[in-house]
Amino acid sequence: MARPDGRLPDHLRPVTLTRGWSTHPEGSVLVEFGATRVLCTASVTEGVPRWRKGSGLGWVTAEYAMLPRATNTRSDRESVKGRVGGRTHEISRLIGRSLRASIDLKALGENSVVLDCDVLQADGGTRTAAITGAYVALYDAVTWLAARRSLAGRPENVMHRSVAAVSVGVVAGEPRLDLNYDEDATAEVDLNVVCTGTGDFVEVQGTGEAGVFSRGQLDALLDLAVAGCLDLAEAQRKALS
């Protein structure tokens, strides 16, 4: 069955990582996975949360949000609702966990980095695009710290592994890489996979949206995801070169 945008099952959407998109943050990246666009900024502050003080370790955390009209119908801002929704909180924590896997918190020292990932336009894969872009923004923030002699080591030693993420799923019985919204909405199986630049797993989230799935299907999806993440890692390397 043909995909909505004509891609082969194992092809990513066009990926673009534009560094320095915002003037003020220590690191900023506009990441595009096809029509999905996420602005990722990395803001550095000296010091760490109270519970972390005196440990010699840094801290990296994340916040995720969507613009009201990032989708085909407008959603109220969560600030107006007076609370952060469960989905938003879950994705924020996922991004934070994923990016902490990329950095040596001891080498970061008692500095904090907050990653803000704001979805400008959503067409599926917003959380995976956010993770992929946030890695590049975090790297630039660490480079900024190194230039101020606020780190014990070089940026490439502090950022000791790259991290990227991609969605995979079974749509119309076919394993597919990097689902857009139309595919995600009809997927029988849906996974979000976070990998390092060497293909090791950081996190795997998956559900059988329309029932159950086999071990063989899971293996096929993970193979697709690893290949996709390795391609994304190469895009990150090129963006940072």
UniProtKB/Swiss-Prot annotation:
Phosphate binds at R87, G125, T126, R127. Keywords: Nucleotidyltransferase, RNA-binding, rRNA processing, Transferase, tRNA processing, tRNA-binding. Its EC number is 2.7.7.56. Transmembrane segments: none annotated. One of its GO terms (molecular function) is 3'-5'-RNA exonuclease activity. Pfam families: RNase_PH, RNase_PH_C. One of its GO terms (biological process) is tRNA processing. It catalyses: tRNA(n+1) + phosphate = tRNA(n) + a ribonucleoside 5'-diphosphate. PANTHER family: EXOSOME COMPLEX COMPONENT (PTHR11953), EXOSOME COMPLEX COMPONENT RRP41 (PTHR11953:SF0). Phosphorolytic 3'-5' exoribonuclease that plays an important role in tRNA 3'-end maturation. Removes nucleotide residues following the 3'-CCA terminus of tRNAs; can also add nucleotides to the ends of RNA molecules by using nucleoside diphosphates as substrates, but this may not be physiologically important. Probably plays a role in initiation of 16S rRNA degradation (leading to ribosome degradation) during starvation. This is Ribonuclease PH. The lineage of its organism: Bacteria, Bacillati, Actinomycetota, Actinomycetes, Micromonosporales. The gene is rph.
